[in-house]
Amino acid sequence: MADASVRVEDKLFYNRYLVDSGRAHIKVRPHTEPPPALLSMLKLCPARCYELNEAGQVEVTVDGCVECGTCRVIAEPSGDIEWTYPRGGFGVLFKFG
């Protein structure tokens, strides 16, 4: 039986990422007050790519994104983010096992 005490963060550590510098596949729409969809991403993103900066705005760091699509479903329909697939060969490289 699998060890139930293994955290998601520990499993994500084994994945590798090929960052496409200067071409983020997720862009947050500029805002002064974070909309509800972006605030929900602070808790819902499994890779914890969304954070509040010191000005109280939501920022995204795509370097650790697992491309699960959660933010695409929650924040893209409202226009709070722009989500595109990473260019071929870039993004998450999953390690199975």
From Swiss-Prot:
<keyword id="KW-0535">Nitrogen fixation</keyword>
<dbReference type="Pfam" id="PF05187">
    <property type="entry name" value="Fer4_ETF_QO"/>
</dbReference>
<dbReference type="InterPro" id="IPR017896">
    <property type="entry name" value="4Fe4S_Fe-S-bd"/>
</dbReference>
<keyword id="KW-0408">Iron</keyword>
<feature type="domain" description="4Fe-4S ferredoxin-type">
    <location>
        <begin position="56"/>
        <end position="86"/>
    </location>
</feature>
<dbReference type="GO" id="GO:0005506">
    <property type="term" value="F:iron ion binding"/>
</dbReference>
<comment type="similarity">
    <text>To ferredoxins from P.putida and C.tartarivorum, ferredoxin I from A.vinelandii, ferredoxin II from D.desulfuricans.</text>
</comment>
<keyword id="KW-0813">Transport</keyword>
<comment type="function">
    <text>Could be a 3Fe-4S cluster-containing protein.</text>
</comment>
<dbReference type="InterPro" id="IPR007859">
    <property type="entry name" value="ETF-QO/FixX_C"/>
</dbReference>
<dbReference type="InterPro" id="IPR012206">
    <property type="entry name" value="Fd_FixX"/>
</dbReference>
<keyword id="KW-0249">Electron transport</keyword>
<protein>
    <recommendedName>
        <fullName>Ferredoxin-like protein</fullName>
    </recommendedName>
</protein>
<dbReference type="GO" id="GO:0009399">
    <property type="term" value="P:nitrogen fixation"/>
</dbReference>
<keyword id="KW-0411">Iron-sulfur</keyword>
<keyword id="KW-0479">Metal-binding</keyword>
<dbReference type="GO" id="GO:0051536">
    <property type="term" value="F:iron-sulfur cluster binding"/>
</dbReference>
